[in-house]
């Protein structure tokens, strides 16, 4: 496995750290949407608490 990871050292950094990954140029207009997408599950988690508060935590 060590040999395989050393074959492409320039791509290894982007595979380990996805925060620095870039979208292809054709999809650059979707970059702001892609930045917000990981937060969407947190909104559903918070919505569950709001929903339970609305029904008095039954």
Curated annotation (Swiss-Prot):
It is found in: Plastid, Chloroplast thylakoid membrane. Coiled coil: none annotated. The keyword Nucleotide-binding does not apply. The chain crosses the membrane at residues 29-49. Residues 1-21 form a propeptide. Its main location: plastid. Keywords: Chloroplast, Membrane, Photosynthesis, Photosystem II, Plastid, Reaction center, Thylakoid, Transmembrane, Transmembrane helix. It comes from the Eukaryota. One of its GO terms (biological process) is photosynthesis. Disulfide bonds: none annotated. InterPro entries: PSII_PsbK, PSII_PsbK_sf. GO terms for cellular component: chloroplast thylakoid membrane; photosystem II reaction center. HAMAP family: PSII_PsbK. Belongs to the PsbK family. PSII is composed of 1 copy each of membrane proteins PsbA, PsbB, PsbC, PsbD, PsbE, PsbF, PsbH, PsbI, PsbJ, PsbK, PsbL, PsbM, PsbT, PsbX, PsbY, PsbZ, Psb30/Ycf12, at least 3 peripheral proteins of the oxygen-evolving complex and a large number of cofactors. It forms dimeric complexes. One of the components of the core complex of photosystem II (PSII). PSII is a light-driven water:plastoquinone oxidoreductase that uses light energy to abstract electrons from H(2)O, generating O(2) and a proton gradient subsequently used for ATP formation. It consists of a core antenna complex that captures photons, and an electron transfer chain that converts photonic excitation into a charge separation. This is Photosystem II reaction center protein K. The gene is psbK.
């Amino acid at each position: 496995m060590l040999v395989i990871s050393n074959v492409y050292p320039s791509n290894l950094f982007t595979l380990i750290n996805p925060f620095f990954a870039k979208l292809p140029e054709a999809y650059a207009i979707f970059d702001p949407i892609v930045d917000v997408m990981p937060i969407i599950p947190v909104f559903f988690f918070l919505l569950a608490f709001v929903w339970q508060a609305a029904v008095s935590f039954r």
